Amino acid sequence: MPPESSLNAEMSKKISFFGLKGLKLWVWVCLVVGVFIVMILCILSLWITFRRKSRRSSSKFPFNQIPHVSKDIRVDRAGFQNPHPESLYIEMNDKSTGKTMMSHLGRTKSSDNDTLSQCSSVNHHERACSSHSGEEGGFGSAGRQYGGGPVTASPLVGLPEISHLGWGHWFTLRDLELATNRFAPVNVLGEGGYGVVYRGKLVNGTEVAVKKLLNNLGQAEKEFRVEVEAIGHVRHKNLVRLLGYCIEGVHRMLVYEYVNSGNLEQWLHGAMRQHGNLTWEARMKIITGTAQALAYLHEAIEPKVVHRDIKASNILIDDEFNAKLSDFGLAKLLDSGESHITTRVMGTFGYVAPEYANTGLLNEKSDIYSFGVLLLEAITGRDPVDYGRPANEVNLVEWLKMMVGTRRAEEVVDPRLEPRPSKSALKRALLVSLRCVDPEAEKRPRMSQVARMLESDEHPFHKERRNKRSKTAGMEIVETKDESLGPSGSETKP
């Protein structure tokens, strides 16, 4: 009998299994193969489902998904044994205490507390002092701290602990939709190329500002990471506090404390002027607070933070007229061994330091120049660049140098200021501003020195046996020596 006929005969035999009779062998073979295939499909289905769930759960640790975008931002994985092997740590050195802190970007409870600040005034307004969020910050070389007052509760109190991180809070998209009424247009506080800022209220009643970043060619990822790593782990009463963030799908959002009295640009040039004009004391309080914040970023922590976009609209003001430096989307971090970095020129026209604009070399001296322009803006009430004015008055810095050089310094004061500042107060502020905008970067003072100058009730340079006369922008200004400060504001060697 041919083999084919024998095989057909065998496959056609009727066999009984499991009580089933009369089924041919080939039918049983097909049933077994079919059951095997179904089992394989079930196993694959279970495996795929498990993988999807594991991906969802891993997305709750968002920093593992964000690519490193700048070599200037140093994020160190912990080099010691720790209970969170997949967590990230950011190394921070506080120069004022000599301590090294490791900021943990993993799941743990938050214990952030705040302190309060002071009071100031505005024409036609009376405001009482009250407790306000903020924290102390120290100046490394100055050896002192600014801030103080009773400790107040964290704005994150009452939120689900499962979302707490070491320095802030992880918010879901649903959390922020509820807080902002689904990002209603009526809650828009401001917008720009970076995205839109909304006012919101968390479930615990805390008012917040939610920055929703626009994902233009990955810019949202870049700005998100820069801001989180620049200020997510630092606390100072004059820095706007980053409360947390949201990463969900393509959404990148940052959640800040809500600062309720606008910004310096609005008070000097915009809508807040309808509430009255800032007094000289209020302006100097805002400027001094900004100087303290920059001194903390430049001198009290490592790596130091260069803000790169100091301008009036980034100086938020609370209801006690305390400055809150904000918007760190352009910030760069410098290690202690770096004198500068080379980077693409970014910033706001009129505030950018000339050496940075010309060469792309960036360090903290660029921020100091921008601060000097900001101080001039507060003194004069003028924009840094105003093409609506005569040609010789378009550039604020050049116009002021010309006015000082022709001995007309008292004419530069904002005409809306009532009462006007004393001659000594005006002279001190002008001297500080001119030193900050010195075209030679190395001659600009450090921000801790600037803060001390602005806080002093006397001339910033104490008298010695003899005065040294120098010319600043063409006008002779008596500039006395300090035992520790040279004519450029830098430390002198014994």
Curated annotation (Swiss-Prot):
One of its GO terms (molecular function) is protein serine kinase activity. It is found in: Membrane. Its main location: membrane. It is an enzyme of class 2 (transferase). It catalyses: L-seryl-[protein] + ATP = O-phospho-L-seryl-[protein] + ADP + H(+); L-threonyl-[protein] + ATP = O-phospho-L-threonyl-[protein] + ADP + H(+). The chain crosses the membrane at residues 28-48. Residues 442-494 are annotated as: Disordered. The modification Phosphothreonine is found at residues 172, 343, 348. One of its GO terms (cellular component) is cytosol. The modification Phosphotyrosine is found at residues 256, 356. It is a single-pass membrane protein. Gene3D superfamilies: Phosphorylase Kinase, domain 1, Transferase(Phosphotransferase) domain 1. Keywords: ATP-binding, Kinase, Membrane, Nucleotide-binding, Phosphoprotein, Receptor, Serine/threonine-protein kinase, Transferase, Transmembrane, Transmembrane helix. The modification Phosphoserine is found at residue 313. Its EC number is 2.7.11.1. Residues 462-471 have a biased composition (Basic residues). SUPFAM superfamilies: Protein kinase-like (PK-like) (SSF56112). InterPro entries: Kinase-like_dom_sf, Prot_kinase_dom, Protein_kinase_ATP_BS, RLK_Ser/Thr-Kinase, Ser/Thr_kinase_AS. ATP binds at residues 189-197, 211. Belongs to the protein kinase superfamily. Ser/Thr protein kinase family. PANTHER family: OS01G0323000 PROTEIN, OS01G0631700 PROTEIN. This is Probable receptor-like protein kinase At2g42960. It comes from Arabidopsis thaliana. The lineage of its organism: Eukaryota, Viridiplantae, Streptophyta, Embryophyta, Tracheophyta.
